[in-house]
Curated annotation (Swiss-Prot):
GO cellular component: chromatin; cytoplasm; cytosol; nucleoplasm; nucleus; RNA polymerase II transcription regulator complex
PTM-bearing positions, type Phosphotyrosine: 641
Name of the encoding gene: Stat6
Protein localization: Cytoplasm; Nucleus
UniProt protein name: Signal transducer and transcription activator 6
Self-association and partners: Forms a homodimer or a heterodimer with a related family member. Interacts with NCOA1 via its C-terminal LXXLL motif.
Domain SH2: 517-632
Amino acid sequence: MSLWGLISKMSPEKLQRLYVDFPQRLRHLLADWLESQPWEFLVGSDAFCYNMASALLSATVQRLQATAGEQGKGNSILPHISTLESIYQRDPLKLVATIRQILQGEKKAVIEEFRHLPGPFHRKQEELKFTTALGRLQHRVRETRLLRESLQQGAKTGQVSLQNLIDPPVNGPGPSEDLATMLQGTVGDLEATQALVLKRIQIWKRQQQLAGNGTPFEESLAGLQERCESLVEIYSQLQQEIGAASGELEPKTRASLISRLDEVLRTLVTSSFLVEKQPPQVLKTQTKFQAGVRFLLGLQFLGTSAKPPMVRADMVTEKQARELSLAQGPGTGVESTGEIMNNTVPLENSIPSNCCSALFKNLLLKKIKRCERKGTESVTEEKCAVLFSTSFTLGPNKLLIQLQALSLPLVVIVHGNQDNNAKATILWDNAFSEMDRVPFVVAERVPWEKMCETLNLKFMAEVGTSRGLLPEHFLFLAQKIFNDNSLSVEAFQHRCVSWSQFNKEILLGRGFTFWQWFDGVLDLTKRCLRSYWSDRLIIGFISKQYVTSLLLNEPDGTFLLRFSDSEIGGITIAHVIRGQDGSSQIENIQPFSAKDLSIRSLGDRIRDLAQLKNLYPKKPKDEAFRSHYKPEQMGKDGRGYVSTTIKMTVERDQPLPTPEPQMPAMVPPYDLGMAPDASMQLSSDMGYPPQSIHSFQSLEESMSVLPSFQEPHLQMPPNMSQITMPFDQPHPQGLLQCQSQEHAVSSPEPMLCSDVTMVEDSCLTQPVGGFPQGTWVSEDMYPPLMPPTEQDLTKLLLENQGEAGGSLGSQPLLQPSPYGQSGISLSHLDLRTNPSW
């Protein structure tokens, strides 16, 4: 967006004072065109500025006339144009100063309103600055030539006035510098213009590095190549002028000018050798990779030589890279710290593409020699680089030119499990390094706001979405990385985060670092959840406590999706259950990994669960997820088979055997307070429970609830051999005893499943009575069962595990689930009514 595009959105009252000497109506007609002219860079009253100002006045009048005619406003605009010409015709520099003041005021107003200027405006201003400097430089070269020719002609005839050959004066006498002074000033202008090009090269390199974290990047080097080539042309012209004026210059002055020109050329040539295609910044040994370099001045200096120079690629350590950067000029050579195969290619000119480049297509790092690391630094924190080097001779004197270019820092790994930590090192270095730094120095602590920008860019680039993170997401991430439950975004604005907090310190109560957890979310979202995130169906970065505050007062079946806080690369469904008394319970279903979602998609899993009704806040789930449902295949397939499908259920939703008064109270208490365990089951027509099992009328008095956060137990009768289990009954979480009065035990101690000995029906003692006298049911009243296997008992101990992996006991109905149990009271929650999502 242009500067005027933002100005037009602001209140006119804030801008009225800017348009006193130049009507706002004319500013509106000129719009973006006005910003594309070098008003801000014509500072001074010399001939160059005067000529440019006159040209701008004429162009402004023509632009206004054309725009007014196109919009049919000629009659109302022509008087303004006439006034403009009458005021500024005699002094066009005054128009330049007026519009420069308006643009500066507009920029200040935009920064106050929007906090930053538009990116395209910045780029255009930088381009205008260089174009103006180059134009001024070319003008000075012409002046120098005229002055030299005047001196030489005057020396022959003695009649030519130098003053008449230089540009006519504007306000007062013209320039009176002699040739040496003018040449020194022109070389100074060349050095200043070269500094603009070198800065632009550094900006390009920095943008290339930031692109590794997802920042948009304009990779084309065509514009930079044109700038470098234009400066080489100026260099050649000045070199000719100094040579032609050797008789008019003192030897010392001439030598100084030549030395300065040579330094300009050397710096320009060595700086124009760039790594256009960077090698992977996380580089695995024995893996092929590509890289490429570009010589911006190759077309001018290499020509069409029969034998192009060869470019070599070598691996260097951080210490070697630092020594190279501090050396005066390119080094003679370095010892490679790794063995790279296929590491030499020719540097060739390509006329069709108008570039000089070398592309390494089959590089392979065979092995790496590790160096001594600093302190507690791990191998995934050790940074290296690829050094690209070449040399060629220049000019009739065969001047040897050596070119070197360092790649961005990279981390070498030998195993895939090092990839995650290596990416953290690269992410930190790319985001927080400075231009012109000593390789590869980077800050140990950075502002949290910069970290938020980095995480947001990385997330959008890695996932491939235009939907970034929201303020609520950053609040949750800050709470996580700082281990601070502050509920205000402002509490973290001025804090700094360290490298150790980012990827060295283990998060409290977890087995992983902040980056390892965040990278797991990136991978899961990229592989399985991109479309869900882009459709804003996933809140994602939100704590369980905040989930409770959002869902507690919502209708039954309201749910949302959040990334697991205690597992790497998991997403869970949190939903509200309302009891008949109106009380609420928030439950979190066991997280799904990328592997789970590759078996059955998230949308289909949500469709499978009937208890999920509305996506928070009030969007029906079918409306929200319909586009993510997989069409169900009906009937037979091409081979005549009836189609099957995999569907998800929550184990709590499976029916329980219904007790009858004739039967003993040998029923597993159902743990309604535990986190439901999502399981995959093939659809079946088999009924459950089996029809042969009689139902109980009541369980209320005989049901025993196990305490929370303990291993599931089986409560057994005194006689361990008097146990039978109904066929196909779900594995019990507890067996309640039923005894005769004379053998009653008031409070039997629960026993672990592993302590119980199960026997087959043939080993059971004969019944000695009927219910409710306390005896166990005979074979004809309750079908005999096969004893549970070791696998069954293992499943019993493992089922209904919490998200953190601990065993959970039974919970009363409508109490918060242990999986999603809140650690703070609702009075401490951030109960914002309008979150960003």
